[in-house]
Amino acid sequence: AWAVGIGNTHLAQMKQGWLESPILYMALIGRPGANKSHPLSFAMKPFLDYDYEQNKLFEEQYSKFEEKMCMSRKERIENGEDGFPQEPVRKRFLVSDVTPEGLSYIHAQNKRGLCLWTDELSAWFKNFNRYNNGSEEQFWLSIFSAKTTISDRRSSKSSIFIKRPYISVIGTIQKKILSELAKGERSSNGFIDRILFVMPNLQQKARWSDRELPDNIERDWQAIIQHLIDMECQINEQQEIEPHVLSFTEEAKARLYEWQHHFSEQCDNETNDTIVSIYCKLEIYIIRFCLIIQLARWTCGECDKEAIDLLSVERAIRLTEYFKNSAISVQNILNENMLTAQQQAIVNHLPATFTTAQAHDVAKENDMKSRTLERFLNDNIGVLFRKEKHGEYSKINS
């Protein structure tokens, strides 16, 4: 919600020419009945309320526009109206089921930015090939990096040109559908690595409770997000948003560089290319987190927004570590879904930490040959298992 409120109004500058938008692709994971949708609806309600009011205003304006268009130009001028009335624009933050072409059209009218909000995220990626094979997926890969998009509409001779797009994505997904997300090229072209997964440890079905949120919680949240919504945007001569660019303080940048160097060492020691790819995307996300956290603190009156400070970086590091662990958990779920019954039985029977000898004993009990076991262990280092030292392993998802 913070990121959507910021949109294209602010950017983080890591180095000269390296700017990051607060674009997030996020999935809330849980079993059916795990209460995934309600917290998301609560967080996005201020935008939903804004869009509702703007839609009512648009309908009123469009009705008047149609009345004017039914007049002749002479009649419009005689009535004190503009000879060529401008068609009204519907202001909004949220979109749902929409094609890239339709999304580009809406974005051109709402240059501050949009959020694709879908209750079931599976509907988003299952539609990627419904029109042009693979083109929608490429569209979202480009949007993630805020690359200029050009949409040539079939019904118009003109093109929609969006210099710096901002579209975040958020929705819920069930654990059993995660494997659908990794189908096709999405696991190899880095698409799935761009998604931030929120997966609570507690996956039980929510129990009904008489407890109510304090009255001030919703009111305060509405006021906080409304502060972002009401934030003035600077518009340049080309009618494009001129974002406020935040650089880092010297101590904040030094801490971020220190973290990145340590993170790079983890990548160097990681044998699984999929995990390395996830780590690389998190290096982009941490800069975006820094921007979002700084603006969140500014909105609440805790700091200024002249530059991103050390406290925002420290909090962004903690947030990145959370998403790193969540991504690894998701990869483990995906890998377990692809295991044979024999392989799954071996994983289930292995203790949290084990030796090669123990693994051979478990393999023997499940009719797996020694050479097959060794290949299974080696192929899944960094995926299912971690090699602690020679002859000793641990299970990653334990």
Which positions does each model-derived feature cover?
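Phosphate-handling catalytic cores of nucleic-acid transaction enzymes
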Residues: 1-398
